[in-house]
Amino acid sequence: MKKRNKGLVEQTTTEKNNFSRKTAWKVFWWVIILAVVIGVLAYIFSPRAATAVVESWKLNGGSNSTLTAKVSGFSNELTFKQINGSTYVTDTILQVSITFDGLNSPLTVTAHKTVNSNGNVIFNIANLSINQSNGQITVNSNGTMMNGGSSNNTKSIAGFETLGTFIAPDTRARDVLNGLFGLLPIIIFVVFFLLFWRSARGISAGGREEDNIFSIGKTQAKLAKSTVKFTNIAGLQEEKHELLEIVDYLKNPLKYAQMGARSPRGVILYGPPGTGKTLLAKAVAGEAGVPFFQSTGSGFEDMLVGVGAKRVRDLFNKAKKAAPCIIFIDEIDSVGSKRGRVELSSYSVVEQTLNQLLAEMDGFTSRTGVVVMAATNRLDVLDDALLRPGRFDRHIQINLPDIKEREGILKVHAENKNLSSKISLLDVAKRTPGFSGAQLENVINEATLLAVRDNRTTININDIDEAIDRVIAGPAKKSRVISDEDRKLVAYHEAGHALVGLHVHSNDEVQKITIIPRGQAGGYTLSTPKSGDLNLKRKSDLLAMIATAMGGRAAEEEIYGNLEITTGASSDFYKATNIARAMVTQLGMSKLGQVQYVPSQGTLPSNVKLYSEQTAKDIDNEINFIIEEQYKKAKTIIKSNRKELELLVEALLIAETILKSDIDFIHKNTKLPPEILLQKQEQQAKQKLNKSEVKPESETNS
């Protein structure tokens, strides 16, 4: 029922733009921070000298004098090479300067002293070593008197102590690294926690906070702005008229309040899948120009108890803030099923969510301006409390489109397609009874794909035919290897369906027969209603459908015998049995009377029966009786019209697919149509030509 239109402009587009800008600023600041960190580290690790204070030193005189100094800022990991330098000792002041230009560079220690009568004393420093046990620096030196005095003069300065300065390698880098290594476990823990927190919130996936541990209790509904209008929807005139009142209320709520009318609380759309229920809800929001919260029934539930009820509250709280607006819950049967029909293990969880939904729709809290719309394929399974007035006031059934609506839907979807002028969309609509709007859209799309595949710019009638077959039975299996005997057997089977359908009293007429394999089927026969699309079926129509379904097996048995029947009739039996069972247990069309033994599907668990064992046997016997009677009828038709059967088979073997015009010609005239005869003559001529070109080997050798 619907045109393929996105129809929703998510308001999260603005949020995504804001998120992009925020992300850009975050990236910018992270780059700045990273640059600062790199600069600090570069400063820390750059090779340079720093100053440390010599806390104390002592020079013991003698020929092998030693200089012991305790220096702050030194660490035991330092090692030094051979040290060369000079030491000057003065009478009153002893100064020590140690220069260091790198970890592995030579170290020079200089001491100076002036002696009154003897001149200067020079000491040559041989080496410098570190005593790792006490952290003191020990300098071993050899001294020589320049004025010829004895080395005992050097002992006169023993015990002299003072302070000095020490130029040493910078140890702050080493200290910073030690501190960082100490903080490393904490940093790793913080980083992992931040990563977990960000991933749990879903920030890495475009900034959306869906399906994460921190938003378990938040609604999964998407807030959007609908652009769909009623003009985008073909058909459904009565349904759209009903929904216009909702549109008017959302546009003019004061008009209803002044009249004292209670505002519509909810609308539930129900019907077969693909009929346009979701599109209608979008159209209401688009016509009213209000926000549209779209959710699914299964989106409320989660593995944790109580999450469903919390998400319902969150959804309605957001809707109240955005009022006037529409809440649309698709497949509401997953959360609104009748209470008491589920097993105890899941009952309490589902009931909590449903109870919260009931309270929000008609409870103590006001929700003026919020209209709830829902869609389901199974209205019969919904809880009665959910369907009562005050919650879902309107129940609108969305049926499969009739022939007029199908034509309109096809026109909507063919607007931007280049269809051949020979294609009549009315004829296509006649050939697609029971198709939903989604299936009709798929027919047009498949036909377009077939044209593109053949590098054509125009869609022809053959593309439409193939597209319909694809939607009904799947793509053709033309590459499947089938023997001539199996091909002939399939032709008899499908011709049997068609022949019985032509001779029974029914509202259906045979439209097409094909023996081209599709999916699991070797072929199929298509029948459509003669006049319109009847929702009501007569008993004669149902019996005719059973007889037609049994026609394939009847033809096999008539031609090949009881021992040569095949498994090709399994789907036919399934169809016939379902029709017969419905006639007996639901429709009151049997000898058991006007009683419904099986309520509407879904109202009771499958293991619960409302009848006795004897009644169950009577039901089975009556179903078997109906099917056997129609099978006998099908066999009688096959035997009485054997010639017509053979003509249908011959036409199928020649053309593989025959349409209604050819089928009706054979049925009325009991002979092949001219088009089929022409194809037969062409095939015979081709076979003769092939035989004449293939000469026996003996003739060639002679």
UniProtKB/Swiss-Prot annotation:
GO terms for cellular component: plasma membrane. The chain crosses the membrane at residues 27-47, 176-196. One of its GO terms (biological process) is protein catabolic process. The keyword Methyltransferase does not apply. Residues 690-702 have a biased composition (Basic and acidic residues). It is found in: Cell membrane. Residues 48-175 are extracellular. Binds 1 zinc ion per subunit. Its EC number is 3.4.24.-. Keywords: ATP-binding, Cell membrane, Hydrolase, Membrane, Metal-binding, Metalloprotease, Nucleotide-binding, Protease, Transmembrane, Transmembrane helix, Zinc. It is an enzyme of class 3 (hydrolase). ATP binds at residues 271-278. Residues 682-702 are annotated as: Disordered. It comes from the Bacteria. One of its GO terms (molecular function) is metalloendopeptidase activity. Residues 1-26, 197-702 are cytoplasmic. Pfam families: AAA (PF00004), AAA_lid_3 (PF17862), Peptidase_M41 (PF01434). InterPro entries: AAA+_ATPase, AAA_lid_3, ATPase_AAA_core, ATPase_AAA_CS, FtsH, P-loop_NTPase, Peptidase_M41, Peptidase_M41-like. It is a multi-pass membrane protein. HAMAP family: FtsH. Acts as a processive, ATP-dependent zinc metallopeptidase for both cytoplasmic and membrane proteins. Plays a role in the quality control of integral membrane proteins. Homohexamer. In the central section; belongs to the AAA ATPase family. In the C-terminal section; belongs to the peptidase M41 family. This is ATP-dependent zinc metalloprotease FtsH.
